[in-house]
Amino acid sequence: MPLRADLQQSCRIKYIKIPEVARMLHIPDDTPVWTDDFRILTREQLNIPALHMIGHAHFQAAGAKLDTHFHCNMEFVVVLKGKQQYIVDGKLYTLYGNDIFMTYPYENHGSGGGSQDVCEFIWFQFDMSSSQNFLGLVPPYSEYLFRQLLNYRHRTKKANMKDLPVLQRAFQLLGSEEISQQIQGYSYFLQFVTNNICTTDIELTREVYSTDIQEAIYYIHTHLMEDLNIEIIAGHCGLSASRFKAKFKEELGITPHAYITSLKVDTAKIFLKDPGNTITDVAYQLNFSSSNHFSSVFRKYTGCTPTYFRNHRFSNIY
């Protein structure tokens, strides 16, 4: 698919002065970006009323921390793979594949003191200033979607796993130079929004995990200091190893091995707060084969070494 020629600029950020409020970082997301791991389509490129932007990020190694900031629009983040963390009003939200995360206009959020994790996600923003011609629709459809978003109260919820490829396809087609493909992308985007965000459901949260996968998660958390074997975890849940791995990834959007490793890294951050724990102590407490192996994994998931993390007190959010 040919890529649009105007997608080569870098994103900019700016400060907005707000009376009687501490100076806050505003990220307008109004400049096109098109790199291997970070892409943004702006409202001028999209030509869809009220859709301020849509972006795609694919971090294959830990990235820089996301500073606390706000947008003037309602923002949704849909995690496709891996793990992502955000802090809003001092509360930490940990997201995995298939999770949807929402922030309101002008609401401060960021990744806290830590780096962004290995993950892939799509995010988009709605301009909620008017229901007229919302998302290019006419009444009653425009008013229905606008009203559903105004009444949206889920900080996090689960997306339908089958709709994730729909959202990915929407982004790909919206970035095309062909108008016919842009129209298809618009259709796919509306399909995802109506099926997963502008719904009439009362509660769609992490409780959708099946009983056996909930058992696996509990087992992993309670045996984290041990040598966690996939076959043993699968047997504990009454599943074959192959079925367990497939079902775990289907429901969490991340492999059991990646989930365990990520959890061990988060636990290591807590252990590193204790000056009595050496790097080697932490490595062996969490069953890494060596301190070098631990340091290598820690760096991949956080973007820094355990020593650097400890010295700079990045663990203050845990």
Question: Where does each model-flagged region fall?
Answer:
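Short, locally clustered residues in the helix-turn-helix/winged-helix DNA-binding domain
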Residues: 80, 197, 221-225, 269-273
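Generic protein-terminus/edge-of-domain signal
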Residues: 1-100, 107, 115, 140-144, ...
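Ligand-binding loop in jelly-roll beta-barrel domains
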Residues: 106-131
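Short, charged, solvent-exposed linker or helix-capping segments at domain edges/interfaces
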Residues: 132-140
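Pre-recognition alpha-helix immediately N-terminal to the DNA-recognition helix
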Residues: 211-219, 260, 264-270
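An amphipathic alpha-helical interaction segment
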Residues: 122-124, 129-133, 150-218
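Basic/polar phosphate-binding segments, predominantly the helix-turn-helix DNA-binding elements
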Residues: 200, 221, 226-265, 277, ...
